[in-house]
């Protein structure tokens, strides 16, 4: 299988619960290498730009408000079939449908405050990584 990169966000509600280390441990236990990470507090402009595909949808303003309500942790994960494996670890977007043992089952508070984000395709991952990480900020660790 090919090595892929995927993009992950630990959202404000999960950061506030002080579970960053627990989530990182689960990434590593699942076989991912964390090849880039940083904590930041999104501006409204950054959040609107990142979620631009949802502009005009009924939940958009609430999503932007939530994502700017506190710090987030953005990360680049590397591994075999990383996009799908990461999504499996996250669980269903709606935590009510998330299987036990997934990150959203464990850390989500609601559909909007679902604790985590993960890229839905290799193409989305590349776009999302480039949105938050510049040249030289992602360090390959595959060996």
From Swiss-Prot:
The active site is at 117 (pros-phosphohistidine intermediate). Homotetramer. Monomers and dimers have both been detected. SMART domains: NDK. ATP binds at residues 11, 59, 87, 93, 104, 114. Gene3D superfamilies: Nucleoside diphosphate kinase-like domain. One of its GO terms (biological process) is GTP biosynthetic process. Its cofactor is Mg(2+). Pfam families: NDK. GO terms for molecular function: ATP binding; metal ion binding; nucleoside diphosphate kinase activity. GO terms for cellular component: cytoplasm. It catalyses: a 2'-deoxyribonucleoside 5'-diphosphate + ATP = a 2'-deoxyribonucleoside 5'-triphosphate + ADP; a ribonucleoside 5'-diphosphate + ATP = a ribonucleoside 5'-triphosphate + ADP. Its main location: cytoplasm. Belongs to the NDK family. Keywords: ATP-binding, Cytoplasm, Kinase, Magnesium, Metal-binding, Nucleotide metabolism, Nucleotide-binding, Phosphoprotein, Transferase. Major role in the synthesis of nucleoside triphosphates other than ATP. The ATP gamma phosphate is transferred to the NDP beta phosphate via a ping-pong mechanism, using a phosphorylated active-site intermediate. It is found in: Cytoplasm. Phosphorylated, probably on Ser residues; monomer and dimer are both phosphorylated. It comes from the Bacteria. This is Nucleoside diphosphate kinase. Coiled coil: none annotated.
């Amino acid at each position: 299988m090919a090595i892929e990169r995927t993009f992950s966000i630990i959202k404000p509600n999960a950061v506030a619960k002080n579970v960053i280390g627990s989530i990182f441990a689960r990434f590593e236990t699942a076989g991912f290498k964390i090849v880039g990470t940083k904590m930041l507090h999104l501006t409204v402009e950054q959040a609107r730009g990142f979620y631009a595909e949802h502009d005009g949808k009924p939940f958009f303003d609430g999503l932007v408000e939530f994502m700017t309500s506190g710090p987030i942790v953005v990360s680049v994960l590397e591994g075999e079939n990383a996009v799908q494996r990461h999504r499996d670890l996250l669980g269903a977007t709606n935590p009510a449908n998330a299987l036990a043992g997934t990150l959203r089952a464990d850390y989500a508070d609601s559909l909007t405050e679902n604790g985590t984000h993960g890229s839905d395709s290799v193409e989305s991952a590349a776009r999302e990584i480039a949105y938050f990480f510049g040249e030289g900020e992602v360090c390959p660790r595959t060996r």
